[in-house]
Amino acid sequence: MCGLAKKLDIEDTLTSLSDQENESLAKPMNDAAEWEHSFSALLEFAADNDVEGFRRQLSDVSCINQMGLWYRRQRFVRRMVLEQRTPLMVASLYGSLDVVKFILSFPEAELNLSCGPDKSTALHCAASGASVNSLDVVKLLLSVGADPNIPDAHGNRPVDVLVVSPHAPGLRTILEEILKKDEIISEDLHASSSSLGSSFRSLSSSPDNGSSLLSLDSVSSPTKPHGTDVTFASEKKEYPIDPSLPDIKSGIYSTDEFRMFSFKIRPCSRAYSHDWTECPFAHPGENARRRDPRKFHYTCVPCPDFKKGSCKQGDMCEYAHGVFECWLHPAQYRTRLCKDGMGCNRRVCFFAHANEELRPLYPSTGSGLPSPRASSAVSASTMDMASVLNMLPGSPSAAQHSFTPPISPSGNGSMPHSSMGWPQQNIPALNLPGSNIQLSRLRSSLNARDIPSEQLSMLHEFEMQRQLAGDMHSPRFMNHSARPKTLNPSNLEELFSAEVASPRFSDQLAVSSVLSPSHKSALLNQLQNNKQSMLSPIKTNLMSSPKNVEQHSLLQQASSPRGGEPISPMNARMKQQLHSRSLSSRDFGSSLPRDLMPTDSGSPLSPWSSWDQTHGSKVDWSVQSDELGRLRKSHSLANNPNREADVSWAQQMLKDSSSPRNGNRVVNMNGARPLTQGGSSVNPHNSDTRESDILDAWLEQLHLDR
């Protein structure tokens, strides 16, 4: 009995031991399943941004860095897989900003921990999550020490796996610039900065979690020194649909001229509240507002003081204030190709999307504007030449031209290029010295005394040449000229070069003199001073001495475009005769034949043309006896009973030149021969020759005085 009882006690002991072992083995298995379920709930709370549920579910702080399986789509592969993730990774993936802040409040949290087959970090998850709060999460992770240079299993850094929301296309640029920085971004920069070059606005808000979608709004203040801070709007102000707002991507609002000279420059006339980002006009206090480059002379170079916060010069600064003033400047707008090409979806793009949209660059400046030096030089030289040509009497260019100086694109009323090209204007005729000598001589003074008798038959041909020369400078002829009608800095120099290189141009010295600034200024001053005192080449009745005749010839020479040319072919002989004479006489009145009198127009050739019209095609140059008589009587004292001729100079010359035996001779004003007091004619050979020369000189002087 005792043995049986002992055997039963041993069996009971073994049974109790086996039950305890089974219980001890089953407890860890139950704890593992319970922990796995608990950790999965923790990851769910992290994905939903539920801070309270995450805090209740977190039983131990050591679980912060634990890894659990998370069902998600594998990156770069269209399939769903289970991957190991920490709570910080899941919260960063879905943009759960509150949970991320709660996890980072524990010092045990590891920021750069990598796990799973892809070896991703929390920064990789935040960059590839495409959440609306991804920028905030990335900045927060970087601010507490996350390393943006850690590669994953495929060698990709966080910047290489960026995925952004389609509602915020401009977010990629911001994230790329932030993640490329190797330095840690501090919290004070996040709170104080308001400019990265772009500002963001909320597009829509979810009623479930209050999260907002961000998109690139407009360019605001210039970049701060670190260039990483942006301004956020937690919610977007809802505006009613306004059909009157123009589409800034189509129509006239997308043209180059509007973008450069009107976009965000012209003030908006809408008095009601509307969306500024969809309006192409400027509004008070708008960051995108810019100065008119036609009124304010500034370059496309960014202002260094404005980048630091403010510029003391304000609108008078010579540099660009902001991104819009820099890239919409006529010197830089659409001078480069857009990297996105035709697939660009920007509302306002500063670049060209095809080669046809590229604006031409000027070789002298390397920008889309002409050189200001070339523009001013062309404008000054053209104005000087136009002024000189218009003030010259008898010049074909004296007629009023519809010529205006070229307008500078960056100056007053200036136009930039491509769409703001040079205005189409008529070009004044280039009358350079030494060219068209025959036309110059026709415009100089011409009278019957200067024309030899054998050349009188050529007057009709001279008149035809003068009319032909006038027709060549008429507007009708200039319209059919091969000379280009557009005036720009390049072809103006070509016009002068072509004129100088032409075969009819021979005086190289005159070119350098006429194109020099000193010659042009001196000529203009002389023309203005002598404009009122200019007389007709034939109407010289106010000139009573050879000195006045010389001054008159000098005035005619100064008024000619060819200042160094003689006034007429006989000018040299006239100067020699006037220099050798010291005679003076009074004005005897005018009794010249009607055909030799000057006309009202003052043209020396008009009498010959009128003869041709009145007498037929053949000109009668014979001298009638009655005309000769009138010519003689016109200079006699009998024809002027009220006036006495001053012939003292002739008597003095006769006394000085005559011999003692003929010293008592006097001059008969009606004849051409010397007479003695007794009336008999004395004709010694030497005396007759000398007296004949004196009378010839006297008659020539009378013709000159008339």
UniProtKB/Swiss-Prot annotation:
Keywords: ANK repeat, DNA-binding, Metal-binding, Phosphoprotein, Repeat, Zinc, Zinc-finger
Official protein name in the record: Zinc finger CCCH domain-containing protein 56
SMART domains recorded: ANK (SM00248), ZnF_C3H1 (SM00356)
Gene3D superfamilies the record matches: 3.30.1370.210, Ankyrin repeat-containing domain
Claim: GTP-binding is one of the keywords in the record: no
InterPro entries, alphabetized: Ankyrin_rpt (IPR002110), Ankyrin_rpt-contain_sf (IPR036770), Unkempt-like (IPR045234), Znf_CCCH (IPR000571)
Residue spans of the ANK repeats: 83-113, 118-150
Residues bearing the modification Phosphoserine: 568
Amino acid composition bias (Polar residues), ranges on this chain: 397-427, 545-560, 600-616, 652-667, 677-686
Pfam families linked: Ank_2 (PF12796), zf-CCCH_AtC3H23 (PF25512)
A GO CC annotation given for this chain: cytoplasm
Positions of C3H1-type zinc fingers: 302-324, 332-356
Origin species: Arabidopsis thaliana (Mouse-ear cress)
Gene Ontology BP term (one): regulation of DNA-templated transcription
Iron-sulfur recorded as keyword: no
Composition bias, Low complexity: 211-221, 580-592
GO molecular function: DNA binding; DNA-binding transcription factor activity; zinc ion binding
Region named Disordered: 211-235, 396-427, 545-616, 652-692
